[in-house]
């Protein structure tokens, strides 16, 4: 009986060991730093010819915007008041992208190593550093008012310091008005705040103002927080300044240490603010970054690093077994906004009603920036697609072509 019991235990251990090995073989693949494995589509049972069609589609459906960054910014926003660029802009490249299936690169086009402005995909990085602050208890809850965390901030103004003149404009308090004191991190993240004010020389009303009487629009009654969705980069920049106030260190450093380095991103990405968005924090001069390229600045990054970030969000914040940002945060980011069900936290565009991408599953999401620059995340197909400078009306066509290769 004793021999039988020992034999049974031995078999049980052996079987479990074998199961463990099988499980390990099936574990998700995550690329190491500077070493991302490529696999031929046929190795993963993908249709190579169809993927080639998808690449051809991407290459022939380039955005019509100018390659000259300054000219493109002017063409997009030049008719707005206070539209002058105040952050870096560069010449952009042509169409580029990568297709990531089960963690492996199975196709690419253009120059994926080229560092280009990513425009409002930057907002996804901004919401991520706020999520890190929530995970660490630095922000107790997204339902807290932002004003509780932000005190008056000194603007770095060397000209004023040299002259000895200290104007009221040298100190800013972006959440001090009666309306702004009501705003929570939640409504700021969802772009339903209707924040009022001027920041870095840009009034909130000057961003994509409606046609008609501008004075009437400027002096209108403010919407209750959470009731109306409006895409507005001044408000995004106010959120970035609030996040800087919480972290008390430059947000690019926060992102680098907690997200980009752990996922093996390159050393080539940069996150810029504006020439006039420098502040003094704890005696240190630091730049408050922008949440996009509306007036220049924001994130400049290559397609591979975009893909790594997409892979992180596809796995709900987990990278090779390490939870870099909580699954709860990703769940919140993927929760539709009441005032716009196609939007979660910035800049997670949701396909809940399949209006964004009719060809894709309803549970997909896309990090989108003007250009268009996109990071498509598809958990049903274990798929991430990075596409740069794809025509806005051609996003679904590209994804449709790729999904035909996966099915």
Region annotations inferred by a language model:
Residues 103, 117-142, 146, 239-243, ...:
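Active-site SXXK
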Residues 64, 147-268, 304-307, 312:
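Active-site-adjacent helix/loop patches that line small-molecule binding or acyl-intermediate pockets
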């Amino acid at each position: 009986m004793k021999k039988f019991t020992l034999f049974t235990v031995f078999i049980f251990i052996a079987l479990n060991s074998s199961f463990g090995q099988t499980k390990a073989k099936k574990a998700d693949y995550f690329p190491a730093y500077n070493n991302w494995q490529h696999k031929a589509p046929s190795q993963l049972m993908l249709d190579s010819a169809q993927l080639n069609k998808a690449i051809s589609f991407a290459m022939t459906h380039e955005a019509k915007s100018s390659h000259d960054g300054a000219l493109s910014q002017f063409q997009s926003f030049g008719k707005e008041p206070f539209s002058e660029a105040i952050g870096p802009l560069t010449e952009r490249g042509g169409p580029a992208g990568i297709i990531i299936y089960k963690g492996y690169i199975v196709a690419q086009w253009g120059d994926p190593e080229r560092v280009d402005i990513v425009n409002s995909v930057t907002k996804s990085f901004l919401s991520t550093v706020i999520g890190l602050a929530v995970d660490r208890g630095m922000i107790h809850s997204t339902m807290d008012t932002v004003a509780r965390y932000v005190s008056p901030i000194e603007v770095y103004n060397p000209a004023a310091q040299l002259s000895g003149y200290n104007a009221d404009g040298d100190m800013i308090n972006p959440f001090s008005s009666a309306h702004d004191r009501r705003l929570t991190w939640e409504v700021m993240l969802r772009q339903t705040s209707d924040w009022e004010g001027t920041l870095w020389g840009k009034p909130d009303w000057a961003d994509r103002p409606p046609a008609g009487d501008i004075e009437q629009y400027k002096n209108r009654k403010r919407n209750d927080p959470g009731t109306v969705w409006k895409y507005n980069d001044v408000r995004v920049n106010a959120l970035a300044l609030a996040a800087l106030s919480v972290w008390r260190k430059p947000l690019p450093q926060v992102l680098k240490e907690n997200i980009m380095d752990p996922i093996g991103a390159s050393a080539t990405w940069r996150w810029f603010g504006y020439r006039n968005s420098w502040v003094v924090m704890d005696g240190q001069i630091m730049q408050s970054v922008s949440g996009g390229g509306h007036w220049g600045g924001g994130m400049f990054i290559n397609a591979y690093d975009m893909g790594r970030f997409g892979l992180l969000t596809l796995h709900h914040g987990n990278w090779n077994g390490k939870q870099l940002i909580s699954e709860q945060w990703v769940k919140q980011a993927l929760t539709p906004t009441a005032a716009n069900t196609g939007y979660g936290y910035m800049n997670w565009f949701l396909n809940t009603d399949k209006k964004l991408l009719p060809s894709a599953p309803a549970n997909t999401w896309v990090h989108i920036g003007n250009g268009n620059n996109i990071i498509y995340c598809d958990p049903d197909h274990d798929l991430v697609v990075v596409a740069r400078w794809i025509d806005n009306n051609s996003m679904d066509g590209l994804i449709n072509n790729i999904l035909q290769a996966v099915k």
